[in-house]
Amino acid sequence: MRILLTNDDGIHAEGLAVLERIARKLSDDVWVVAPETDQSGLAHSLTLLEPLRLRQIDARHFALRGTPTDCVIMGVRHVLPGAPDLVLSGVNSGANMADDVTYSGTVAGAMEGTLLGVRAIALSQEYEYAGDRRIVPWETAEAHAPELIGRLMEAGWPEGVLLNLNFPNCAPEEVKGVRVTAQGKLSHDARLDERRDGRGFPYFWLHFGRGKAPVADDSDIAAIRSGCISMTPLHLDLTAHKVRAELGAALGVEA
């Protein structure tokens, strides 16, 4: 099985090293094409206004000055000697759940794999802070992901669907199981902090937070909060089919 790895935290991210160890428990044919720099929050964006610069680190490790989407395209269309059987994107430092999947470069890497006709999985590890220090239990994803991915590859899933895995913030032995979940919902709390530079011109920092909101029992959020691994199947068809039919009926047009 040929596996292509990418992420959005960059080629030097600890989570990418974790992902490679996970992948090597599944196959010896593992390739890495990851961003040269941190691309967090760039979602499913492409680099169109400047050239892509590819740097070969060794036989199967490459860094690209581009987004996670660029990396998957580069891997599938140029770097690999043949099509991969699986694209793995991650392991992200921090969960990618609920509405955050729309911002996530990690999820976007799996999206692009899916668009290119390759089975794809995004992996993210929840964390906590101890003072100003981020504590990420990478060992949890590393311990549980290989078997879970192996089982998923045996079971298979439909074309046009990617899988979004989130691992809870706990030790490997404290994980309470796996739940197949729905994408949850979080409330937005985005604020702009306006400041002035040395010449008096304004600039802004975006403070992106979340407010309180009800959490559905079957959601990815609920699974992670309960200490379970969350597995959410996401499809690329964004059509709201029920609303499409309702609008057609309301307007008296074909839908």
From Swiss-Prot:
Q: Among its keywords, does the record have Isomerase?
A: no
Which Pfam families does this entry report, sorted A to Z? SurE
> For this protein, what is the EC number?
3.1.3.5
Entry cofactor note text?
A: Binds 1 divalent metal cation per subunit.
Q: What class of enzyme is it?
A: hydrolase
Q: Which residues cross the membrane?
A: none
- Residues holding a divalent metal cation: 8-9, 40, 92
Q: Which reaction does it catalyse?
A: a ribonucleoside 5'-phosphate + H2O = a ribonucleoside + phosphate
Q: Which NCBIfam families match?
A: PRK00346.1-4 (NF001490), surE (TIGR00087)
UniProt function note? Nucleotidase that shows phosphatase activity on nucleoside 5'-monophosphates.
Q: What is this protein called?
A: 5'-nucleotidase SurE
Organism, as annotated: Brucella abortus (strain S19)
